[in-house]
Amino acid sequence: MEVILLERVAKLGQMGETVKVRPGFARNYLLARGKALRATEANKKRFEDQRIQLEARNLERRNEAQAVAEKLDGQSFVLIRQSGETGVLYGSVSTRDLAEVLTQNGFTVGRDQFSLNQPIKTLGLHTVPVVLHPEVEVTVTVNVARSPEEAERQARGESTVVRDELDLEELGLEVGAALAEAGPEGEER
């Protein structure tokens, strides 16, 4: 199916281009969200008549996104979550959680504006891209920790995950002593 793009769509094209896409993608995403029109003669004429208005609206949205981007770029946000000793979260941090944290901090960002391939499932610092406009993208740092104190340590670069630290020399002596006591058949003497 051919459609006329009403705004820039990543990996597809610029505003005003006529592109061929699969019918399901056109119906369920592009047409449903107002990002495109079917490429009929009537719609082509309508687009050309409204092109100046669409470009002005796109420029206005881009300028608004740029203003938010200047404040948001490079910001760090802390999320407190429960996790195991190895640093794996019991749940996960999804785009919904990220949108909620940014909203609490005064930024209006929808969950569909985050570019997360999969939810965050570990403690630590994570960089997350935020697409505010098809032409404006920023990154924020998400600090996932068990407590505010741990978040501060992570921000300074200290490791907070507990690792089993064994003294190998001491372990070798204990194993050797146990084997000597057991005898050749593995039985206690």
UniProtKB/Swiss-Prot annotation:
Pfam families xrefs: Ribosomal_L9_C (PF03948), Ribosomal_L9_N (PF01281)
Keywords for the protein's UniProt record, in alphabetical order: Ribonucleoprotein, Ribosomal protein, RNA-binding, rRNA-binding
Specify whether Heme is a keyword of the entry: no
| Gene Ontology CC terms | ribonucleoprotein complex; ribosome
The processes (GO biological process) annotated in the record are:
translation
Q: Which GO terms describe its molecular function?
A: rRNA binding; structural constituent of ribosome
Q: Transcription regulation: present as a keyword of the record?
A: no
User: What family does this belong to?
Assistant: Belongs to the bacterial ribosomal protein bL9 family.
Extract the PANTHER family matched here: 50S RIBOSOMAL PROTEIN L9 (PTHR21368)
Q: What is known about what this protein does?
A: Binds to the 23S rRNA.
Tell me the protein's name.
Answer: Large ribosomal subunit protein bL9
Say which species the protein is native to: Methylobacterium nodulans (strain LMG 21967 / CNCM I-2342 / ORS 2060)
Please state the gene responsible for encoding this protein: rplI
